[in-house]
Regions:
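Thiamine diphosphate
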Residues: 1-148
Length: 148
């Protein structure tokens, strides 16, 4: 398992210096880590779509942005991602937890969204990678997304 500190340090190495998102129990340690960081700015959002807007504004102001959300809120990001980010080529990194992953037993309310999450990303032309478990694989994924 990748620690929150390792993730934050790796993202910082690639220049990610602005984080936003909505609370998610699976991301608590990462959210707390960026809140407590002296190098990274964090602004909490009231909705996933708002987080995309905040991150996009930060990019326009010269920041490299990360949005942290649960996949159950992915639907709330579709309009800003397709109308704002796609149209104006505004890059942001989405860290999206995958509740309802068909390979992992989860709560019933996450079942449908878990099944369709990857399809939503594909249909909206959002490049995506499954979050790696090993630190070395995280470095490879970050190198890949940083060069795309």
């Amino acid at each position: 398992m990748i620690s929150a500190n390792f993730l934050i340090n790796q993202l910082s190495k690639y220049g990610f210096n602005f984080f936003t998102g909505v609370p998610c129990s699976h991301l608590t340690s990462v959210i707390n880590g960026v809140i407590n960081s002296k190098k990274i700015k964090y602004i909490g959002a009231t909705s996933e779509g708002e987080a995309v807007g905040i991150a996009s504004g930060a990019w326009l102001a010269g920041k490299k942005s990360v949005v942290m959300i649960q996949n159950s809120g992915l639907g709330n990001t579709i309009n800003p991602l397709t109308s704002l980010n796609h149209t104006f080529k505004i890059p942001i990194l989405l860290i999206t937890t995958w509740r309802g992953d068909p390979k992992i037993k989860d709560e019933p309310q996450h079942e449908l969204m878990g099944k369709i999450t990857r399809n939503i990303l594909r249909l909206t032309k959002i490049k995506n990678e499954i979050f790696p478990i090993k630190e070395n694989n995280l470095k490879k994924v970050l190198l890949k997304i940083n060069n795309s």
